[in-house]
A protein has these predicted regions:
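Cofactor-binding beta-sheet edge motifs in enzyme active sites
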Residues: 1-660
Length: 660
């Protein structure tokens, strides 16, 4: 375990192993974004070794440096410079050792394929380790490998673990098997926050295969030899609960407060006010939550799917009353969740069951449990007012975002602003604006979600930009461009228009819509083409996307992430809505919570990666999902005249909104 206050140490980042392979270490987690591959590309280039020799360890809390978690599309931006410098520093030390060993000045030395070379001599890195591993504080000014010598960075590569995943060799949490491992099942209360009044476990304890009925406060579960036995016994536990309504917190955060906004709105030549509504939606991972806990007297080992291995470690240590250093978290491959795995629900429950039974325990949630008990994306009501001058330019903007908390990190205004208020401030050229975030109470459990609040805010802002263009008789593209001064932002918007043939309107019942944004330094613009039937059914036909993530480590990896984000966001826009009553989720299965399937996929998604290579790399795990819903809604209006200010864009809603 590495202390979170330590400076960057080489031994925390890079190891040259005795077999000549290289181990690179990071606290980040790869749940489909391609981080493992990108990090391997960076390290292979800076150390001058074949990429197949680079092994990347992610999230093992006994090995990697402390990390707060993998979220917000920060990973490449944060880790790439650190790994690059560490690998370059390792190469520097190897050259120093070779110079002393060979008696040659360093200007006579070079590296190639995992060895120091000089004339006809070749010294493999492993022969330079002696008894001293590479170590030391990584300097900020270490010399990096020249761009022209990089073999991997900037080139498309398949994910290193892709073959294992598609052939079934990859290890997911449910694949873990430990000696003496039992299975667990939880006894669920009727509602979140309920308190346990009494418990009768007599019948459950007498059932076949039952090892223990475990209670820790208001947490109750059964441990048995087989999962079916554990579930049957859990159903036989007679628990009396006292339901206590739980509501989320409230807060108000001024995010931008320019002077005289209301006065300028009143004086505007054209004024427009609209409200946009987005429902809560489920994380709905293909693989429900699972964890294996092995709790012994001397400590605990956890096998989990998580975005926050150190956060899980800290929570497990607190739950079990152990020092942090006595808990090891070993992250496993997990289904893509983008936020859901920030919570350690299954891990905490498995740890309690393991401690209470004295056995390693595998706990797997059911699909119904996943829908009913996992956190969701909050609902949002977005109120926007803007004024235009006689030339059709924006002169004032007022934006009120009403939503719930998007994180469990507390109510610090700065935290709320970058989570629940993400992308609430429009990315266009500055005009007088007042932007206020209102955190409203809810009985629904809410937390991190892919793009946090950005997808909600951008849906409202980009739909409203189209409506402003409409009331001022301007083309939606031209209207946006007149309000963009950032050169990189302008370029992606212009290029997506060119790539999609924006000026060539599709015929029949088809229409195109545009939406764009800047997400944490990544510039993204999309055009969607849809077909709307007379009955209001929406079919997504094509999507064009131009993205600028700065320096691009793996272009194919970027395309994969953007395509996946578009597909998922299209599902949010067209299909998904979590129904709840007094905090209880009502639709807890695929039959009542539909998501987009293969038949709903568009004919094509064209992603053009046009990164500014002179700029630092930024994230791509979330930006692709941000503008899609607005692009689709704007396309639906272009195709049918139906302006939808809420999602999902169901057949019934679209038909009702169609003119005539």
């Amino acid at each position: 375990m590495r202390d979170r206050r330590e400076p960057e140490k080489l031994e925390q980042r890079i190891r040259i192993e005795r077999d000549g392979t290289v181990t690179a270490l990071s606290g980040k987690i790869d749940f489909g974004q391609g981080l493992r591959t990108a990090f391997a590309q960076i390290v292979a280039d800076e150390l001058d070794v074949p990429i197949e020799r680079v092994h990347v360890v992610l999230g093992d809390t006994d090995q990697v440096p402390f990390d707060f978690g993998t979220f917000g599309s920060h990973s490449v931006a944060q880790e790439a410079p650190l790994l690059r410098k560490a690998a370059a520093f390792a190469r520097r030390q190897l050259l120093d050792r070779a110079s002393a060993k060979l008696g040659l000045t360093e200007d006579k030395l070079d590296t190639a394929a995992g060895a120091v070379v000089a004339g006809g001599k070749r010294v493999p890195y492993v022969e330079l380790l002696d008894s001293e591993p590479l170590a030391g504080t990584v300097p900020d000014d270490v010399s990096l490998m020249p761009d022209q010598r990089r073999k991997y960075t900037g080139r498309s590569m398949p994910h290193l673990e892709a073959r294992d995943i598609v052939t079934g060799r990859a290890t997911f949490v449910a694949d873990i098997r430990l000696p003496g491992m039992a299975r667990g099942a939880m006894v669920r209360p009727p509602a979140r926050g309920a308190k346990l009044r009494s418990l009768d476990d007599t019948a459950a304890k007498a059932m076949p295969g039952v090892i223990a009925v475990v209670r820790d406060g208001d947490v109750v579960g059964v441990v048995a030899e087989r999962e079916d036995q554990a579930r049957a016994a859990a159903a036989a536990v007679d628990a009396d609960w006292h339901a206590i309504p739980v509501e989320g917190p409230t807060a108000e955060v001024p995010m931008r407060s320019d002077a005289n906004v209301d006065e300028k709105l009143r004086a505007a030549s054209v004024r427009l006010t609209q409200t946009y509504v987005l429902p809560p939606i489920a994380s709905a991972p293909i693989g429900p939550s699972a964890a294996v806990a092995d709790v012994r007297g001397y400590g605990a080992t956890m096998y989990v799917g998580t975005h926050r291995p150190f956060g899980v470690r800290d929570q497990i240590a607190k739950t079990l009353g152990l020092p942090e250093k006595k808990v090891r978290v070993l992250p496993q491959i997990t289904s893509g969740t983008y936020g859901r795995n920030s919570a350690a629900d299954a891990a905490i429950e498995a740890a309690i069951l393991s401690k209470g039974s004295g056995r390693p325990v595998l706990l797997q949630w059911t699909r119904e449990e996943e829908f009913a008990w996992s956190p969701s994306r909050p609902e949002a009501v977005l109120e926007i007012a803007a004024g235009l001058n006689v030339d059709g330019g924006i002169v004032a903007w007022r934006y009120d975002e009403h939503t719930n908390v998007h994180t469990a990190a507390g109510l610090d205004p700065q935290v709320l602003g970058v989570t629940s208020g993400r992308n609430a401030i429009p990315p266009y050229a500055e005009f007088p604006a007042r932007v206020t975030l209102h955190i409203e109470p809810t009985r629904l459990r809410t937390a991190n979600f892919r793009s946090l609040a950005a997808a909600e805010n951008v849906f409202a802002i980009e739909s409203f930009m189209d409506e402003l263009a409409g009331v001022s008789a301007q083309d939606p593209l031209a209207f946006r461009l007149r309000h963009i001064t950032d050169k990189r932002f302008r370029r992606v918007v212009e290029h997506v228009a060119e790539r999609s043939g924006w000026g060539e309107r599709p015929g029949g019942r088809r229409g195109r819509g545009i939406a764009c944004t800047v997400y944490h330094g990544t510039y993204v613009a999309q055009v969607a083409e849809v077909e709307v039937s007379l009955s209001g059914a929406v079919r997504l036909v094509k999507v064009w996307c131009v993205v600028d993530p700065g320096e691009t480590v793996n272009p194919e990896g970027v395309r994969n992430q953007i395509e996946g984000g578009i597909q998922q966001s299209a599902s949010w826009a067209l299909k998904e809505e979590l129904l709840h009553r007094d905090g209880r989720v009502m639709n807890t299965g695929w039959d009542t919570y539909p998501i987009a399937t293969f038949r709903d996929a568009p004919e094509s998604i064209e992603v053009f990666v046009e990164g500014d290579e002179s700029a630092a790399p930024t994230g791509v795990g979330e930006p692709g999902a941000v503008p899609t819903a607005a692009a689709i809604a704007n396309a639906v209006f272009a195709a049918s005249g139906a302006r939808l200010r809420s999602v999902p864009l169901t057949r019934e809603r679209v038909r009702k909104a169609m003119p005539g």
